[in-house]
């Protein structure tokens, strides 16, 4: 059973964007570790941040509503709009979410250390209206200035692109890749930074094509005035010593002699799973000739139980020299055109 983000924020499933913002503001103030000293506060603060990041983003919310937490984080929501798989991973830093929401400032420095002039404590302030109005802050935590940059105006940094090279064997069987990234994260004050390493786990599905994109939303560097960039990995095929790839087909080049091309031969054709398939070639091998072994290629991405084909191309080796008597025999028996 996945997390119920609506329950975490204390709202109904049909809540509006404004309801989500108000709920996050209330819960974030309630469970912020600078105020709430209970042992569970830090974990609740993190859950609230994750719930807000999902429900405040229309695409992530749509996927979550349809597939739940497992579908959102497992890539069940289809593509990212660029042909890649969309999957969400929470960045793990609720303080960065808090700082971005409240404009990169720390409102706790203002009112958590003392009671307000009107006599209300912080618990009352989170329940009643706008807790920051007395300090010149708007409801989203930004100064009341028409020229200020609020969350609705933040722009996301361009995606950070990485190539992810995989072998044909890995595409054939599927595999798991763990990629280490380093990024800057905002501290709780919303101004200073710290370096942070993170391991991103990528499930390579059977048959994925070169160019497939895997997107980790907002895993890039954090800054006070922009949304972190998405980290995007693009699948690239490694060169293979035996095979070339053609979509879901693979191509093997069999080297044979001129005599074998004319008189026939038997060859062993290797496969990606380590077997050898014997093949008899009785026809004359002509330029461009191919043979096909059905079902021995790569899995189809959308139907991995079915596979493409193994294509055999022939490369004929010609002798460097030939004797006069052999030439005479060839002239006698081979057609002139």
Curated annotation (Swiss-Prot):
**Can you list the GO cellular component terms from the UniProt entry?**
cytosol; plasma membrane; Z disc
Assembly behavior: Homodimer. The C-terminal section interacts with the C-terminal tail of OPRM1. Also interacts with SDIM1.
Protein name in UniProt: DnaJ homolog subfamily B member 4
Q: Which residues carry this modification: Phosphoserine?
A: 122, 148
Is Chaperone one of the keywords? Answer: yes
Q: Where in the cell is it found?
A: Cytoplasm; Cell membrane; Cytoplasm, Myofibril, Sarcomere, Z line
Query: Which of UniProt's keywords are assigned here?
Result: Cell membrane, Chaperone, Cytoplasm, Membrane, Phosphoprotein
């Amino acid at each position: 059973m996945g997390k119920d983000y609506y329950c975490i924020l204390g709202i109904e499933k049909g809540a509006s964007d404004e309801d989500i913002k108000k709920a996050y503001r209330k819960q974030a103030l309630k469970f912020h570790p600078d105020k709430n000293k209970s042992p569970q506060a830090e974990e609740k603060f993190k859950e609230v941040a994750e719930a807000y990041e999902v429900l405040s983003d229309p695409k992530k919310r749509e996927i979550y509503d349809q597939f739940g937490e497992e579908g959102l984080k497992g890539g069940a929501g289809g593509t990212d709009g660029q042909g890649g798989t969309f999957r969400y991973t929470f960045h793990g830093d609720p303080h960065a979410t808090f700082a971005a929401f409240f404009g990169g400032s720390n409102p706790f420095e203002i009112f958590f250390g003392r009671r307000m002039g009107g006599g209300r404590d912080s618990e009352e302030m989170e329940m009643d209206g706008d807790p920051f109005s007395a300090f010149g802050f708007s409801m989203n935590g930004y100064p009341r200035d028409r020229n200020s940059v609020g969350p609705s105006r933040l722009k996301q940094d361009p995606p950070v692109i990485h190539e992810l090279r995989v072998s044909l064997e890995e595409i054939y069987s599927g595999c798991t890749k763990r990629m280490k990234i380093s990024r800057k994260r905002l501290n709780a004050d919303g101004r200073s930074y710290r370096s942070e390493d993170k391991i991103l786990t990528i499930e390579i599905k059977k048959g994925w094509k070169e160019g497939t994109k895997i997107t980790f939303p907002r895993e890039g560097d954090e800054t006070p005035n922009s949304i972190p960039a998405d980290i995007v990995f693009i699948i690239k095929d490694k060169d293979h010593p035996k095979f070339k790839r053609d979509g879901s087909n693979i191509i093997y080049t069999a080297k044979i002699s001129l005599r074998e091309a004319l008189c026939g031969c038997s060859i062993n054709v290797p496969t990606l799973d380590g077997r050898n398939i014997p093949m008899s070639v009785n026809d004359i091998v002509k330029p461009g000739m191919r043979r096909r072994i059905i079902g021995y290629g790569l899995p189809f991405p959308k139907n991995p139980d079915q596979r493409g084909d193994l294509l055999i191309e022939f490369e004929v080796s010609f002798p460097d020299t030939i004797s006069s008597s052999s030439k005479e025999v060839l002239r006698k028996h081979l057609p002139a055109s």
